[in-house]
Amino acid sequence: MSAQIIDGKIISQTVRQEVAARVKARTDAGLRAPGLAVVLVGQDPASQIYVGSKRKACEEVGFISKSFDLPSSASEQQLLDLIDELNQDPTMDGILVQLPLPAGMDCTRILERIDPEKDVDGFHPYNVGRLSQRIPKLRSCTPKGIITLLERYNIEVRGKHAVIVGASNIVGRPMTLELLLAGATTTTCHRFTQDLEGHIRQADILVVAVGKPNFIPGGWIKEGATVIDVGINRLENGKLCGDVEFDVACQRAKYITPVPGGVGPMTVASLIENTLLACEQYHSA
Protein backbone atom coordinates (compact mmCIF):
# COMPACT_ATOMS: atom_id res chain seq x y z
CA MET A 1 0.00 0.00 0.00
CA SER A 2 1.18 3.50 -0.79
CA ALA A 3 -0.75 6.26 0.95
CA GLN A 4 -2.66 8.94 -0.92
CA ILE A 5 -1.20 12.34 -0.12
CA ILE A 6 -3.60 14.84 1.45
CA ASP A 7 -2.61 18.07 -0.33
CA GLY A 8 -3.16 20.99 2.01
CA LYS A 9 -1.85 23.49 -0.53
CA ILE A 10 -4.58 22.69 -3.05
CA ILE A 11 -7.40 22.58 -0.48
CA SER A 12 -6.25 25.80 1.19
CA GLN A 13 -6.21 27.57 -2.16
CA THR A 14 -9.73 26.34 -2.85
CA VAL A 15 -10.87 27.68 0.53
CA ARG A 16 -9.26 31.05 -0.18
CA GLN A 17 -11.00 31.25 -3.54
CA GLU A 18 -14.34 30.48 -1.87
CA VAL A 19 -13.75 33.21 0.71
CA ALA A 20 -12.68 35.70 -1.97
CA ALA A 21 -15.90 35.04 -3.88
CA ARG A 22 -17.99 35.71 -0.76
CA VAL A 23 -16.05 38.89 -0.03
CA LYS A 24 -16.65 40.11 -3.59
CA ALA A 25 -20.36 39.36 -3.22
CA ARG A 26 -20.38 41.47 -0.03
CA THR A 27 -18.63 44.43 -1.58
CA ASP A 28 -20.72 44.21 -4.76
CA ALA A 29 -23.79 44.47 -2.51
CA GLY A 30 -22.43 47.64 -0.92
CA LEU A 31 -21.17 46.00 2.28
CA ARG A 32 -17.69 46.60 3.64
CA ALA A 33 -14.87 44.07 3.31
CA PRO A 34 -13.93 42.09 6.43
CA GLY A 35 -11.06 43.50 8.48
CA LEU A 36 -8.27 41.69 10.33
CA ALA A 37 -5.84 43.28 12.79
CA VAL A 38 -2.52 41.43 13.07
CA VAL A 39 -0.42 42.21 16.14
CA LEU A 40 3.25 41.23 16.37
CA VAL A 41 5.37 41.87 19.45
CA GLY A 42 9.14 41.69 18.99
CA GLN A 43 11.42 40.56 16.18
CA ASP A 44 11.12 36.76 16.25
CA PRO A 45 12.07 35.68 12.68
CA ALA A 46 9.66 32.74 12.53
CA SER A 47 6.80 34.91 13.79
CA GLN A 48 7.60 37.55 11.17
CA ILE A 49 7.33 34.89 8.44
CA TYR A 50 4.01 33.60 9.79
CA VAL A 51 2.60 37.11 10.10
CA GLY A 52 3.72 37.91 6.57
CA SER A 53 1.87 34.90 5.18
CA LYS A 54 -1.29 35.89 7.04
CA ARG A 55 -1.14 39.47 5.76
CA LYS A 56 -0.59 38.23 2.21
CA ALA A 57 -3.58 35.89 2.50
CA CYS A 58 -5.75 38.80 3.63
CA GLU A 59 -4.79 40.80 0.56
CA GLU A 60 -5.50 37.85 -1.74
CA VAL A 61 -9.11 37.46 -0.57
CA GLY A 62 -9.91 41.18 -0.42
CA PHE A 63 -9.79 41.77 3.33
CA ILE A 64 -8.75 45.03 4.96
CA SER A 65 -5.62 44.17 6.94
CA LYS A 66 -4.04 46.39 9.58
CA SER A 67 -0.61 45.62 11.03
CA PHE A 68 0.50 46.56 14.52
CA ASP A 69 4.17 45.82 15.22
CA LEU A 70 5.24 46.49 18.80
CA PRO A 71 8.89 46.39 19.94
CA SER A 72 10.02 43.57 22.20
CA SER A 73 10.42 46.23 24.89
CA ALA A 74 6.66 46.93 24.85
CA SER A 75 4.93 46.38 28.15
CA GLU A 76 2.07 43.99 28.71
CA GLN A 77 -0.17 46.96 29.49
CA GLN A 78 0.65 48.55 26.13
CA LEU A 79 -0.46 45.37 24.39
CA LEU A 80 -3.63 45.19 26.47
CA ASP A 81 -4.42 48.82 25.65
CA LEU A 82 -3.98 48.10 21.93
CA ILE A 83 -6.33 45.12 22.17
CA ASP A 84 -8.89 47.32 23.93
CA GLU A 85 -8.70 49.81 21.05
CA LEU A 86 -9.11 47.08 18.45
CA ASN A 87 -12.04 45.58 20.33
CA GLN A 88 -13.81 48.92 19.83
CA ASP A 89 -12.81 49.36 16.17
CA PRO A 90 -15.93 48.62 14.07
CA THR A 91 -13.86 48.03 10.92
CA MET A 92 -11.85 45.18 12.47
CA ASP A 93 -13.73 41.86 12.63
CA GLY A 94 -10.79 39.81 13.82
CA ILE A 95 -7.82 40.35 16.12
CA LEU A 96 -4.80 38.09 15.86
CA VAL A 97 -1.96 38.31 18.39
CA GLN A 98 0.96 36.30 17.01
CA LEU A 99 2.41 33.76 19.43
CA PRO A 100 4.78 33.19 21.12
CA LEU A 101 4.85 36.42 23.09
CA PRO A 102 8.05 37.77 24.70
CA ALA A 103 9.03 36.32 28.06
CA GLY A 104 7.27 37.97 30.96
CA MET A 105 3.96 38.55 29.20
CA ASP A 106 0.91 36.70 30.52
CA CYS A 107 -0.33 34.94 27.39
CA THR A 108 -3.59 33.79 28.99
CA ARG A 109 -4.46 37.28 30.18
CA ILE A 110 -3.73 38.75 26.76
CA LEU A 111 -5.74 36.20 24.79
CA GLU A 112 -8.67 36.54 27.18
CA ARG A 113 -8.64 40.33 26.63
CA ILE A 114 -9.66 39.84 22.98
CA ASP A 115 -13.40 40.17 22.38
CA PRO A 116 -14.60 36.55 21.87
CA GLU A 117 -16.49 37.73 18.78
CA LYS A 118 -13.17 38.91 17.29
CA ASP A 119 -11.14 35.90 18.45
CA VAL A 120 -10.40 34.52 14.98
CA ASP A 121 -7.61 32.28 16.32
CA GLY A 122 -10.27 30.47 18.36
CA PHE A 123 -8.17 30.48 21.55
CA HIS A 124 -10.53 32.35 23.90
CA PRO A 125 -12.09 30.13 26.61
CA TYR A 126 -15.53 31.25 25.42
CA ASN A 127 -14.95 29.85 21.94
CA VAL A 128 -13.30 26.65 23.20
CA GLY A 129 -16.27 26.28 25.54
CA ARG A 130 -18.72 26.66 22.67
CA LEU A 131 -16.92 23.87 20.83
CA SER A 132 -17.08 21.62 23.89
CA GLN A 133 -20.82 22.30 24.14
CA ARG A 134 -21.29 21.33 20.46
CA ILE A 135 -22.22 24.87 19.37
CA PRO A 136 -18.98 26.08 17.73
CA LYS A 137 -18.58 29.51 16.20
CA LEU A 138 -14.95 30.66 15.93
CA ARG A 139 -12.93 27.45 16.03
CA SER A 140 -9.22 26.96 16.66
CA CYS A 141 -7.59 27.29 13.24
CA THR A 142 -5.38 24.21 12.97
CA PRO A 143 -7.98 21.67 14.18
CA LYS A 144 -10.62 23.38 12.02
CA GLY A 145 -8.29 23.09 9.03
CA ILE A 146 -7.72 19.40 9.70
CA ILE A 147 -11.46 18.75 9.79
CA THR A 148 -11.74 20.59 6.46
CA LEU A 149 -9.08 18.30 4.96
CA LEU A 150 -10.91 15.19 6.17
CA GLU A 151 -14.18 16.51 4.74
CA ARG A 152 -12.74 17.52 1.36
CA TYR A 153 -11.11 14.10 0.93
CA ASN A 154 -14.34 12.35 1.99
CA ILE A 155 -12.57 10.54 4.82
CA GLU A 156 -15.12 8.95 7.16
CA VAL A 157 -14.77 10.09 10.77
CA ARG A 158 -18.03 8.98 12.37
CA GLY A 159 -17.58 5.75 14.31
CA LYS A 160 -13.82 5.67 13.78
CA HIS A 161 -11.19 5.51 16.53
CA ALA A 162 -9.21 8.75 16.48
CA VAL A 163 -5.99 9.05 18.46
CA ILE A 164 -4.51 12.49 19.12
CA VAL A 165 -0.88 12.63 20.28
CA GLY A 166 -0.24 15.91 22.06
CA ALA A 167 -2.54 17.82 24.40
CA SER A 168 -1.70 21.48 23.79
CA ASN A 169 -4.32 24.20 24.03
CA ILE A 170 -3.62 25.21 20.42
CA VAL A 171 -3.93 21.81 18.71
CA GLY A 172 -4.35 18.68 20.82
CA ARG A 173 -7.22 19.61 23.11
CA PRO A 174 -9.43 21.40 20.54
CA MET A 175 -8.60 18.64 18.02
CA THR A 176 -10.05 16.10 20.44
CA LEU A 177 -13.22 18.19 20.71
CA GLU A 178 -13.48 18.57 16.92
CA LEU A 179 -13.18 14.82 16.32
CA LEU A 180 -15.62 14.07 19.11
CA LEU A 181 -18.09 16.48 17.51
CA ALA A 182 -17.56 14.71 14.17
CA GLY A 183 -18.58 11.40 15.73
CA ALA A 184 -15.23 9.73 16.38
CA THR A 185 -14.29 7.78 19.48
CA THR A 186 -11.29 9.74 20.74
CA THR A 187 -8.15 8.96 22.71
CA THR A 188 -5.82 11.81 23.65
CA CYS A 189 -2.22 10.86 24.43
CA HIS A 190 0.22 13.07 26.34
CA ARG A 191 3.48 12.90 28.28
CA PHE A 192 1.95 10.73 31.01
CA THR A 193 0.34 8.24 28.61
CA GLN A 194 1.49 4.66 29.05
CA ASP A 195 1.87 2.29 26.08
CA LEU A 196 1.78 5.01 23.43
CA GLU A 197 2.54 2.43 20.75
CA GLY A 198 -0.49 0.36 21.73
CA HIS A 199 -2.81 3.35 21.38
CA ILE A 200 -1.37 4.36 18.02
CA ARG A 201 -1.64 0.86 16.58
CA GLN A 202 -5.41 1.04 17.17
CA ALA A 203 -5.90 4.42 15.48
CA ASP A 204 -8.08 4.65 12.38
CA ILE A 205 -7.27 8.37 12.38
CA LEU A 206 -4.00 9.55 13.91
CA VAL A 207 -3.26 13.22 14.60
CA VAL A 208 0.24 13.98 15.89
CA ALA A 209 1.27 17.39 17.24
CA VAL A 210 4.29 17.16 19.53
CA GLY A 211 7.04 19.06 17.69
CA LYS A 212 9.61 16.25 17.69
CA PRO A 213 11.07 15.07 14.37
CA ASN A 214 10.07 11.53 13.37
CA PHE A 215 8.78 10.93 16.90
CA ILE A 216 6.26 8.28 15.80
CA PRO A 217 7.82 5.28 14.01
CA GLY A 218 6.07 4.53 10.73
CA GLY A 219 5.82 0.88 11.70
CA TRP A 220 3.34 1.76 14.45
CA ILE A 221 0.72 2.97 11.96
CA LYS A 222 -2.34 0.77 11.56
CA GLU A 223 -2.86 -0.59 8.05
CA GLY A 224 -5.28 1.68 6.19
CA ALA A 225 -5.18 4.50 8.74
CA THR A 226 -5.37 8.22 8.05
CA VAL A 227 -2.30 10.06 9.37
CA ILE A 228 -2.42 13.81 10.05
CA ASP A 229 1.04 15.17 10.89
CA VAL A 230 0.87 18.63 12.45
CA GLY A 231 4.56 18.84 13.39
CA ILE A 232 7.02 20.91 11.41
CA ASN A 233 10.65 20.42 12.43
CA ARG A 234 13.89 21.54 10.81
CA LEU A 235 16.66 18.93 10.74
CA GLU A 236 20.39 19.69 10.94
CA ASN A 237 20.64 19.34 7.15
CA GLY A 238 18.06 22.11 6.76
CA LYS A 239 15.23 19.88 5.59
CA LEU A 240 11.77 20.01 7.14
CA CYS A 241 10.07 16.94 8.53
CA GLY A 242 7.03 16.11 10.60
CA ASP A 243 6.47 14.21 13.83
CA VAL A 244 5.79 10.92 12.00
CA GLU A 245 8.35 8.80 10.14
CA PHE A 246 6.88 9.65 6.75
CA ASP A 247 8.39 7.15 4.30
CA VAL A 248 7.57 4.08 6.39
CA ALA A 249 4.14 5.42 7.39
CA CYS A 250 3.29 5.89 3.70
CA GLN A 251 3.57 2.14 3.18
CA ARG A 252 0.91 1.44 5.83
CA ALA A 253 -1.49 4.40 5.81
CA LYS A 254 -4.31 4.98 3.33
CA TYR A 255 -4.08 8.77 3.60
CA ILE A 256 -1.29 10.95 4.96
CA THR A 257 -0.42 14.65 5.13
CA PRO A 258 3.08 15.68 3.98
CA VAL A 259 5.37 18.13 5.77
CA PRO A 260 5.48 20.77 4.48
CA GLY A 261 2.35 21.27 2.41
CA GLY A 262 -0.17 19.41 4.52
CA VAL A 263 -1.68 20.94 7.64
CA GLY A 264 0.28 24.22 7.62
CA PRO A 265 -1.51 25.95 4.73
CA MET A 266 -4.87 25.01 6.24
CA THR A 267 -4.18 26.96 9.42
CA VAL A 268 -4.04 30.23 7.47
CA ALA A 269 -7.05 29.22 5.35
CA SER A 270 -9.06 28.62 8.54
CA LEU A 271 -8.02 32.01 9.91
CA ILE A 272 -9.38 33.63 6.75
CA GLU A 273 -12.63 31.66 7.06
CA ASN A 274 -12.99 32.65 10.71
CA THR A 275 -12.50 36.33 9.91
CA LEU A 276 -15.23 36.23 7.27
CA LEU A 277 -17.49 34.33 9.68
CA ALA A 278 -16.91 36.91 12.42
CA CYS A 279 -17.80 39.66 9.96
CA GLU A 280 -20.97 37.95 8.73
CA GLN A 281 -22.19 36.67 12.10
CA TYR A 282 -21.26 39.46 14.48
CA HIS A 283 -20.35 42.69 12.73
CA SER A 284 -22.01 42.69 9.32
CA ALA A 285 -23.01 46.13 8.09
From Swiss-Prot:
GO molecular function: methenyltetrahydrofolate cyclohydrolase activity; methylenetetrahydrofolate dehydrogenase (NADP+) activity
GO biological process: L-histidine biosynthetic process; methionine biosynthetic process; purine nucleotide biosynthetic process; tetrahydrofolate interconversion
Signal peptide stretch: none
Superkingdom of this protein's organism: Bacteria
Keywords: Amino-acid biosynthesis, Histidine biosynthesis, Hydrolase, Methionine biosynthesis, Multifunctional enzyme, NADP, One-carbon metabolism, Oxidoreductase, Purine biosynthesis
InterPro entries assigned: Aminoacid_DH-like_N_sf, NAD(P)-bd_dom_sf, THF_DH/CycHdrlase, THF_DH/CycHdrlase_cat_dom, THF_DH/CycHdrlase_CS, THF_DH/CycHdrlase_NAD-bd_dom
UniProt-listed Enzyme Commission number(s): 1.5.1.5, 3.5.4.9
The keyword Hydrolase appears for this protein: yes
Residues annotated for NADP(+) binding in this entry: G166, A167, S168, I232
HAMAP family given in the database record: THF_DHG_CYH
Its job: Catalyzes the oxidation of 5,10-methylenetetrahydrofolate to 5,10-methenyltetrahydrofolate and then the hydrolysis of 5,10-methenyltetrahydrofolate to 10-formyltetrahydrofolate.
Descriptive protein name: Bifunctional protein FolD
Native organism: Photobacterium phosphoreum
Organism ancestry: Bacteria, Pseudomonadati, Pseudomonadota, Gammaproteobacteria, Vibrionales
